[in-house]
């Protein structure tokens, strides 16, 4: 599986903490959302919590880590600072054998970090300081970085900063030139709301593979139920992967619908990495030319494993 998939995304250190619903209400946080914050707010929140765990994160990076767990050979490009969190991030990816083509700068902006609040229902709510990760730009990536891969996987979160949005478009241009498939995750429903028109244009004009959960897909398609969204998406010659939590997953391929049941678990501890690890299982099988049902099954297995622990890594 050497040099088959390249992930590009925000290099974010995850800081995990357990809280109750009152904490979210007190801090005006919407459960299940990702809120972008500045460094002073990050530091203020961090000082008010008891940290459970710190590990390298970021949506696409989590997916690449999952592929490495399955003995694949993924690569990842992200931007870090040469600070404490940057060192943690670099060491973490190198340890699990993700080929990390990092852009390291010693500047005023710190390495990105996200406080992940886990409530008793296992839902995750994130406050993310993008830091230097959001400065990943066209100048940091060239054709040599992408040449030879089968798939480039990008996250919707990159559109939250203009610099990374331009880089996203540049990577698409390089991918098309080199006959590389472009895959994208929708990241979260609020990200889709912020960039819906742009994401829809990407789907129509540029993407080969789109991954999102049921709510994200419905928001993208402006539909109230999944069946209506699926009927619209069947019109496009794309691979669409839709996760539905305990209701399983759906794939749209060649105008056909494939359903897959979820893997039952005894106890859910943290939903943080469910979608990211589902994508890892899907891509591992897809790159091995497995049938679409097996791609979904392996995705479901990895998602089930990761939600039984704190954190987004296996």
Question: Model features per residue range: what roles?
Answer:
Residues 1-77, 87:
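Glycine-rich phosphate/adenosyl-contacting loop at the front of the ribokinase-like
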Residues 151-230, 247-249:
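Conserved beta-alpha-beta core of the PfkB/ribokinase-like small-molecule kinase fold
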Residues 74, 100, 182-183, 240:
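Hydrophobic beta-strand scaffold residues
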Residues 101, 105, 116-162:
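Conserved phosphate-binding/catalytic loop of the ribokinase/pfkB sugar-kinase fold
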Residues 145-147, 203-204, 234:
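A short, aliphatic-rich alpha-helical micro-motif
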Residues 92-109:
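A glycine-rich helix N-cap at a beta->alpha junction
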Residues 64-73, 117-119, 285-288:
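Alpha-helix C-terminal capping segments
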Residues 2-6, 11, 25-33, 48, ...:
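Conserved phosphate-binding/catalytic region of the ribokinase-like
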